[in-house]
Amino acid sequence: MALHVIVGAGPVGAATARLLSARGEEVRLLSRRGGGPEVDGVELVAADATRDLSRHTEGAVALYSCAGPAYHRWTTGWPPLGAALLRAAETSGAVLVTTGNLYAYGAVEGPMTEQLPMRPNSVKGEVRAKLWTDALAAHEAGRIRTAEVRGSDYLGAGTLSAFTALVLPKVLAGRRASAPADLDAPHSWTHTGDVARTLVAVAADERAWGRPWHVPTAPAMSLRRLAGRAAELAGAPAARVTTMPALALRLAGLFNPAAREMAEMQYQLRHPFVLDSSAATAAFGIEPTPTDEALRETIGGVREPAAPR
């Protein structure tokens, strides 16, 4: 039994904790409130990771970054957290495996592979690019061992995205939904359980370190098709979804910080956004969770929200 430390008790952090516990590992899950799954082998710790992380990672073999500052606080919240993760990885010797996303690639044409250069076209993309650049530089200098696991918009219980926040609740209620998207553009949706499986696989294989990996993800599905399938699985009326004008989102941003931050990321929903995850499937044998299964879990999470973490 070895100690694995997870920072962040959201859907990915919780799924990673459950997976490691089921494999008989010792797990320490850190979050500001000390929440998380109450299962055998998982120690729940309330801590400020920007200040206390090195103390909690002593003796760990792996450190998983599954946390994230509030969307509107990325520019101020991520730098100290990223620095704390690097310090903890260096002092403990634990391999640092970070939960990333696709923001750093910017707008691209065609499916996204791990070989794409980072060309962010948003403030949040620049933040993510610097986090990886700093971690990779420390890895190449021999100070730490690291890798990054990148997924697209999440499906799963408790996940937050344009689909789960703006579309799914209204579809389940039989109401018309609106989203800032090309409703028929293909879009990749990543299941949080698959993120956890990839994090654990990468941490365990030193051949996987020093590079990014894309989470095995089911074939792309447009927002319209996803909403329609969700309605069918939930036994709800046929989904009705319309495109939200860009101006409407900007106006909402005057009063809602999350909506304001979504504005610069609209390109991901208004154009094809497809993830190529074949490398991770080939390397680790991880097959993506079928979309129907991921949707059922997501629907269950909306209908029965978890307690605050």
Regions inferred by a protein language model and the residue ranges of each:
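Hydrophobic/small residue at the entry helix of a nucleotide-binding pocket
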Residues: 12
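NAD(P)H-binding glycine-rich loop region in Rossmannoid oxidoreductase-like domains
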Residues: 35-36, 41-92
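Conserved Rossmann-fold NAD(P)-dependent oxidoreductase catalytic core, especially the SDR/UDP-sugar
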Residues: 83-129, 147
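Conserved beta-loop-beta element that borders a ligand/cofactor-binding pocket
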Residues: 101, 133-158
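Substrate-binding strand-loop-helix patch
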Residues: 158, 186-193, 215-233, 242-250, ...
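Substrate-positioning beta->alpha
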Residues: 159-166, 180-203, 210-214
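Terminal hydrophobic/aromatic helix or amphipathic segment near a protein terminus
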Residues: 227-274, 307-309
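Amphipathic terminal alpha-helices
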Residues: 281, 289-309
